[in-house]
Amino acid sequence: MSQNSLRLVEDKSVDKSKALEAALSQIERSFGKGSIMKLGSNENVVEIETVSTGSLSLDIALGIGGLPKGRIVEIYGPESSGKTTLALQTIAEAQKKGGICAFVDAEHALDPVYARKLGVDLQNLLISQPDTGEQALEITDTLVRSGAIDVLVVDSVAALTPRAEIEGEMGDSLPGLQARLMSQALRKLTASISKSNTMVIFINQIRMKIGVMFGSPETTTGGNALKFYASVRLDIRRIGAVKEREEVVGNQTRVKVVKNKMAPPFKQVEFDIMYGEGVSKTGELVDLGVKAGIVEKSGAWFSYNSQRLGQGRENAKLFLRDNPDLAREIELSLRQNAGLIADRFLQNGGPDADDGEAAAE
């Protein structure tokens, strides 16, 4: 009895494998070779290409060393919090590796002088200032489908005004128009973004929901589609000012990884964004180095491998800026211990009430 049962199972397994082979060959005949495959047979799927954000601590918090290529990323926050700065720093890092980048400036507010200060190569940056939301998303779609773009930034979702709204009268009520536009565009874009390995960064603004009694009243513009399609969502906030004597020279910034499909989410980091310079890389090296025990702090003095960096954080930053080889050595050591730093020293913000569902996607 047991032998008959065993034979029956074996026959079924043979039938299953033959049926699977027939189904696979039929799919390949209909849709082309490579339309279906075993995941392990394609090595390119396993390796996730990344682009640095320009912030070492944020790269570590993201868990994969930067923002993922072939994915949609959303950066949102209040006004003047550093959203465009972070996107431009990502473009600058991609260009350093020879990548081709594009900037769809729906807000018509890109400052080329500031972008150059952040390290962006303006000669090789493609820029478009579209008149309507449809035009902006059509340009985005065409560039993504070309397969030649590495990083594309759309600034911002709130400025993607539907054509019907522009052609209508001031004060016309057109509910849900922008949300429908974004939903349709993302359905169309998502497959070509993956195939072309293009990173598309959407910058978004914050609005307040009226009548919310419990949880956060904040929401982002453009409906819910972007929350679902985005692989990474970053919430960026200005939490204070960086001063030299009485003069304000930068912003203290907090970034929370609200959603992350590539690694554990909810990591939270803080760094300085200096005016006319961008993310203070030397400041991050000092702060992270002390947390990880790579840079020693004794009283007000900072030292690395028995070499004094300076008295006080600002002097240590200046020393590292003047000694780039030493700064690179500390950065390399921090990146090699990225997993340990992420687990032990980066804050875990936890899900917010309004972002918990999206973050779990």
UniProtKB/Swiss-Prot annotation:
GO terms for molecular function: ATP binding; ATP hydrolysis activity; ATP-dependent DNA damage sensor activity; damaged DNA binding; single-stranded DNA binding. ATP binds at residues 77-84. HAMAP family: RecA (MF_00268). Keywords: ATP-binding, Cytoplasm, DNA damage, DNA recombination, DNA repair, DNA-binding, Nucleotide-binding, SOS response. Its main location: cytoplasm. GO terms for cellular component: cytosol. This is Protein RecA. Can catalyze the hydrolysis of ATP in the presence of single-stranded DNA, the ATP-dependent uptake of single-stranded DNA by duplex DNA, and the ATP-dependent hybridization of homologous single-stranded DNAs. It interacts with LexA causing its activation and leading to its autocatalytic cleavage. The gene is recA. It is found in: Cytoplasm. GO terms for biological process: DNA recombination; DNA repair; SOS response. PROSITE patterns: RECA_1, RECA_2, RECA_3. The keyword Acetylation does not apply. It comes from the Bacteria. Belongs to the RecA family. It comes from Rhizobium rhizogenes (strain K84 / ATCC BAA-868) (Agrobacterium radiobacter).
